[in-house]
């Protein structure tokens, strides 16, 4: 089971929601098979993002994160829901 729910999927983007009740252990380090630009839509409170070998940083509305193919990264749970937009281009 995935730790998120896709709210909207198009050819250009995915709107994805991470629920406030998710178990933090489900937010594992991972790599994606393609480059991604992620836009933070609704960051809740205290949600963070971390690349491998870097310190985590707070997620803020409208923040853009460029994630390269096969780059290790993770999301760190905060309070409330986290909603992101993953641009497929």
Give names to the regions the model predicted.
Residues 1-8, 14, 83-89:
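Double-stranded beta-helix
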Residues 12-33, 50, 66-69:
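Conserved short histidine dyad/triad with adjacent acidic residue
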Residues 13, 35-37, 81:
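Intrinsic-disorder/low-complexity, polar/charged segments enriched in Ser/Thr/Lys/Arg/Asp/Glu/Gln
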Residues 32-48:
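Short, conserved beta-strand element in jelly-roll/cupin
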Residues 38, 48-57, 70:
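Acidic, low-complexity, intrinsically disordered interaction modules
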Residues 60-64:
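Loop/turn positions that initiate beta-strands
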Residues 68-89:
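Ligand-binding loop in jelly-roll beta-barrel domains
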């Amino acid at each position: 089971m995935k730790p998120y729910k896709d709210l909207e999927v198009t050819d250009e983007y995915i709107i994805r929601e991470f629920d406030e009740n998710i178990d933090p252990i489900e937010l594992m380090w991972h790599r994606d098979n393609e480059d991604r630009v992620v836009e933070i839509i609704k960051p809740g409170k205290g949600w963070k993002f971390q690349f491998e070998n870097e310190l985590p940083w707070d997620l803020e509305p409208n923040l853009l994160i460029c994630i390269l193919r096969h780059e290790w990264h993770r999301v760190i749970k905060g309070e409330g829901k986290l909603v992101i937009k993953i641009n497929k281009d």
